[in-house]
Regions:
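Helix-loop-helix junctions that connect adjacent transmembrane segments
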Residues: 2-9, 46, 50, 123-134, ...
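TM-loop-TM module centered on a large, flexible mid-protein loop between adjacent transmembrane helices
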Residues: 78-86, 118-122, 229-292, 310-343
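Membrane-interface "cap" regions at the ends of multi-pass membrane proteins
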Residues: 1-35, 39-41, 57, 61, ...
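Transmembrane helix-loop junctions in multi-pass membrane proteins
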Residues: 30-34, 109-112, 143-149, 274-275, ...
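A generic transmembrane alpha-helix motif of multi-pass inner-membrane proteins
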Residues: 353, 366-429
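Juxtamembrane helix-boundary/capping and inter-helix hinge elements in multi-pass membrane proteins
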Residues: 40-43, 71-74, 82-89, 215-223, ...
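Membrane-interface loop-to-helix entry segments
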Residues: 127-176, 187-190, 228-229, 351-360, ...
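Hydrophobic transmembrane alpha-helices that form the core helical bundles
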Residues: 39, 48, 57-137, 141-145, ...
Length: 429
């Protein structure tokens, strides 16, 4: 086949796939969870981001192998169904994935509200945060309902802008870093550092979006593997450097006090008030674009899960040629979560949800490894790493956060079991 024809039928090259992965990860996560990470790990925040990144890197290998074996726009949903069959277990995990995306949306909304409210007088910030976060999800849902194609086209531009600002933040801020603030004497306990890394694990969620584009990638055998590794490694380095500059530039107490807008506060020493404003605006732009991308993707996910007969058929019924019922349910749930739960509970739920899903994907790779001739023990190790990370996260979480997490997992399987009972779909299809 001539190269031009191949390129026409498979329009995404290596750097396009890398852009999908990096754009998915560097959404609003780093802006949302930096302050929380510093609060838990203190001077060890860079190490916490590194540990979370290594767990993501192990899982990226499984995604790479599964994407080549089962290229599909269904991505994670398809991998789990192909490995374990479309039964109650697969359905419950896939519903958990959808709920985890709703939690991610709530996190992005809280981050948007926090950074937007940072420009208000101190006594107006609490109410302002709720107003801004609610307005963000309502307006962006409206854009998706209207099918604003310009929003989709703007995504790449927004990704480029926020990456440029983060790189500028690192480049300018590195000169003012105090090594003493990063010394082991300033770290939390080892268990707290591990738990702190896992509570911000959801900042690495996003690389799996490459799987949804696998059908459109040129030379998938080579491109997918390289795209997964390049995107995750790049983001690990970026996050660690951002954490180094943040913790090395300001006392931990200052970052914790400004937890809702920590990255903007960390820009003050090197860039002054202009830096605070620049990072604040970049955070709002980034989290708004992340809300849009995640809202669109999660609505598509409900459509895919419904097509797999794991959610009601109404969710695969398009309205105006788009799966809007899933979109509206997702948006309504996000508004409720973002306004009711605190950042700690939301981060715990989101990170734990994705750790459970990623452990299952690693197990899916191990279960189907013989089909590819790959070494299953690596994926078993990756699944164990996810499980261990989950255990560390739960061990250091508050009772309230763990209760909400257990409720989310129970709700996932409860929704799936109820649907199967009502629809007459067997528990093991």
């Amino acid at each position: 086949v001539p190269q031009s024809k191949a390129a026409a039928s498979h329009p995404i090259g290596l750097w396009g796939a890398v852009a999908i992965g990096v754009g998915g990860m560097v959404g609003g996560g780093i802006f949302a969870v930096l302050g929380l990470s510093v609060q838990i790990t203190k001077g060890a925040a860079p190490l916490a981001f590194l540990l979370a990144g290594l767990v993501a890197l192990l899982t990226a290998r499984s995604y790479s192998l599964l994407s080549k074996s089962f290229p599909s726009r269904g991505g994670t949903v398809t991998f789990i169904n192909r490995a374990f069959g479309p039964g109650l277990f697969s359905g419950g995990i896939n519903v958990l994935l959808w709920l985890s995306y709703i939690v991610m949306l709530a996190l992005y909304c809280q981050a948007f509200g926090g950074y937007a409210a940072s420009f208000l007088p101190q006594d107006s910030r609490s109410l302002g945060r709720h107003v801004f976060l609610t307005a963000a999800i309502v307006l962006i849902t409206g854009l998706n309902v209207a099918g604003a194609s310009t929003v989709a086209r703007a995504e790449r531009v927004v990704v480029a802008i926020k990456l440029a600002i983060l790189v500028l933040f690192v480049a300018v801020g590195m000169a003012g870093v105090s090594a003493a603030r990063l010394a082991p004497a300033q770290w939390s306990s080892p268990v707290s550092v591990i738990a702190g890394g896992m509570i911000i694990f959801l900042a690495y969620e996003g690389f799996e979006l490459i799987a949804n584009a696998a059908e459109d990638v040129t030379d998938p055998g080579r491109t997918l593997t390289r795209a997964y590794y390049i995107s995750v490694l790049f983001v690990i380095v970026l996050y660690v450097l951002v954490a180094v500059v943040s913790v090395g530039s300001l006392p931990v107490a200052s970052l914790v006090q400004a937890r809702d807008y920590a990255l903007a506060e960390a820009a003050r020493p090197a860039l002054g008030a202009a830096g605070f404003t620049m990072i604040g605006i970049a955070a709002m732009l980034s989290t708004a674009s992340a809300i849009n991308a995640t809202l669109y993707g999660s609505a598509r996910m409900t459509y895919t899960i419904a097509k797999s007969r794991e959610l009601p058929a109404q969710l695969e019924r398009p309205i105006w040629n788009r799966p809007l019922e899933g979109l509206l349910i997702t948006a309504g749930s996000t508004i409720a979560l973002a306004n009711v739960l605190d950042l700690n509970s939301i981060s715990t739920m989101g990170s734990a949800g994705f750790l459970i899903v990623f452990a299952t994907v690693n197990a899916a790779e191990a279960r189907t490894a013989r089909q590819r001739g790959s070494a299953p023990w690596v994926s078993v190790l990756a699944a164990a790493a996810c499980a261990g990370a989950l255990a560390a996260l739960v061990a250091k979480s508050t009772v309230g956060a763990v209760t909400v997490l257990v409720a989310m997992v129970a709700l996932s399987f409860g929704i799936e079991a109820t649907f199967r009972r009502v629809s007459g779909t067997p528990a093991r299809a």
